[in-house]
């Protein structure tokens, strides 16, 4: 592995479940279909092809996409990809993401680029098929607090407005004040002016968050053929009617997901299923459906249906039913000729709870791929790293661990009292032998003294480490500064910084560099160096 790549397993930023999945632990095998490899896509294509024979589904999908792209400037490649979806030799690779303001954290870009690059790689290996990258916009989510902000140069910029219901339908009118604040942070460079125009064209020229996000993602990635899909569409929901009815009448998803969760007893569970994994959705409303006393009630409202009434509503207005985190993946795979889902560690963790549910419904389970991750580093930072003689493996360490390790490396004194502790232990072993031959009270005194002296050595070791840190404080300060720049708040850069921060520095080079250097099947953190 190149020195400017870190394996996910060694990065320290992934859960035990994801590490074991990447290591292909046999105990997880029944929780997924095929492991992500170029060879396994052949089997996935065959299986999905067999289970997605309905050409009406393809036509409905294409018609829905054409409708959603009305009034949007569309690239030649995206247009071609939409038309190709009617062809039974065309398959999709999908990633999903919330409608975070101005894309939110950097990893949004990595998700999209991972998806685009995997399509390219598959086309090289399976030229007889077509592969279309899909960005599934999470327009039906209702947790506005998760998406109403982003960080720019360490500052949290928030859009404060009242929000109810699905965020995709939320008006963007109140973003004018936010834009005034953001503009002031950006400066006056050519790249800053581009970012201002991009924000304004996206959010101030479109009336709702779904359209604004589509415009933005299309502007950034349209030339790569990205197709952006909004699942909040009546024509698409109609195809999901049998699954909505099954959920309301029999709650099979709850039963099947709980079966999978039982097999994950050694891991932290990402999401727990509800009895009914559906929301009722209207303008300014998205609330859970609860079955109570023979009726279907909409949580936190007075809306209630009998069984007959709700089944009629499903047939007449399936768009009023919104799948939650458990059922949304099923909805996605029912309406798309999809081969793989690309997501972060948390997303892949909850997908691993779902295979039994997919098997029950006889829907092909997609290949699960952990998205690409990266750290962006400029020339000055890279020079500092080399000057300080820090490896990338070291920079991924927790800060305290890193500083302790570098202090020991720089010190001319051995900051390790293991020998002294071993010598002390040996001395007390002799004393314990003497204690066995006399009164019990002496044995207690020996134990207490051993504990006291061992603790004393521990404290002296800590004091020595502290003293050496003072001796090398200048070097250590530079290490802390470098790590804080690359790992803000001791977290991953990709979770804290917005793309605009880097774009202001390097412009279009940002997306070009990411596109050139992210390899979807590599399962490594990429270190991307830029000007």
UniProtKB/Swiss-Prot annotation:
Taxonomy, superkingdom: Bacteria
In terms of InterPro entries, this protein maps to: Bacillithiol_biosynth_BshC, CC_BshC, Rossmann-like_BshC
List the keywords (alphabetical).
Coiled coil, Ligase
Instruction: Identify the enzyme class.
Output: ligase
Q: Which residues form a coiled coil?
A: 447-481
Membrane-spanning segments: none
Question: What Enzyme Commission number does this protein have?
Answer: 6.-.-.-
Any one Gene Ontology molecular-function term assigned to this protein's record: ligase activity
NCBIfam families given for it? Answer: thiol_BshC
Q: Which family does it belong to?
A: Belongs to the BshC family.
UniProt xrefs under HAMAP family = BshC
The identity of this protein, by name, is Putative cysteine ligase BshC
Give the organism the record lists: Flavobacterium psychrophilum (strain ATCC 49511 / DSM 21280 / CIP 103535 / JIP02/86)
The gene from which this protein is expressed is bshC
């Amino acid at each position: 592995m190149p020195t400017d790549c870190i394996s996910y397993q060694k990065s320290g930023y992934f859960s035990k479940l994801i590490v074991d999945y990447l290591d292909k632990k046999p105990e997880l095998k029944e929780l997924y279909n095929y492991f992500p490899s170029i060879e396994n896509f052949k089997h996935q294509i065959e299986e999905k092809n067999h289970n997605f024979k309905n050409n009406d589904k393809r036509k409905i999908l294409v018609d829905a996409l054409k409708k959603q792209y009305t009034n949007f400037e569309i690239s030649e490649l995206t247009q071609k990809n939409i038309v190709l979806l009617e062809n039974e030799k065309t398959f999709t690779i999908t990633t999903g993401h919330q409608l975070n303001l101005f894309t939110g954290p950097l990893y949004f870009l990595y998700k999209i680029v991972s998806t685009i690059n995997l399509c390219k790689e598959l086309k090289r290996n399976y030229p007889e098929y077509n592969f279309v990258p899909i960005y599934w916009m999470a327009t039906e989510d209702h947790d506005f607090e998760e998406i109403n902000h982003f960080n720019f140069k360490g500052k949290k910029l928030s859009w404060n407005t009242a929000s109810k219901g699905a965020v995709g339908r939320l008006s963007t009118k109140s973003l004018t004040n936010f834009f005034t604040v953001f503009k002031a942070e950006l400066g006056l460079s050519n790249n800053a002016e581009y970012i201002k125009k991009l924000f304004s064209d996206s959010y101030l020229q479109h009336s709702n968050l779904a359209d604004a996000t589509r415009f933005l993602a299309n502007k950034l990635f349209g030339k790569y053929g990205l197709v952006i899909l909004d699942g909040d569409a009546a024509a698409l929901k109609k195809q999901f009617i049998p699954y909505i009815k099954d959920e309301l009448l029999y709650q099979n998803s709850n039963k099947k997901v709980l079966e999978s969760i039982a097999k994950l007893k050694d891991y932290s569970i990402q999401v727990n299923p509800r009895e009914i994994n559906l929301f009722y959705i209207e303008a300014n409303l998205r609330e859970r459906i609860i079955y109570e006393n023979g009726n279907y009630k909409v949580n936190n409202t007075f809306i209630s249906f009998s069984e007959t009434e709700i089944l009629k509503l499903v047939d007449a207005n399936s768009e009023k039913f919104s799948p939650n985190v458990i059922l949304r993946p099923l909805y996605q795979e029912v309406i798309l000729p999809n081969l793989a889902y690309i997501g972060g560690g948390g997303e892949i963790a909850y997908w691993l709870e779902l295979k039994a549910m997919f098997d029950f419904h006889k829907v092909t389970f997609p290949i699960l791929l952990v998205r690409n991750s990266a750290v962006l580093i400029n020339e000055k930072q890279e020079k500092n790293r080399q000057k300080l003689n820090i490896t990338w493996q070291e920079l991924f360490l927790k800060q305290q661990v890193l500083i302790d390790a570098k202090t020991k490396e720089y010190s001319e004194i051995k900051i390790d009292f293991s020998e002294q502790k071993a010598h002390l232990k040996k001395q007390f072993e002799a004393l314990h032998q003497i204690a066995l031959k006399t009164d019990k009270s002496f044995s207690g005194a020996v134990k207490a003294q051993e504990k006291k002296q061992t603790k004393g050595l521990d404290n002296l070791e800590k004091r020595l480490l502290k003293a050496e840190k003072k001796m090398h404080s200048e070097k250590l300060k530079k290490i802390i500064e470098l790590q804080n720049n690359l790992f803000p708040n001791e977290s991953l850069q990709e979770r804290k910084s917005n793309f605009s921060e880097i774009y202001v520095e390097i412009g279009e080079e940002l997306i070009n560099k990411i596109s050139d250097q992210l390899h979807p099947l590599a399962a490594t953190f990429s270190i991307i160096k830029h000007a």
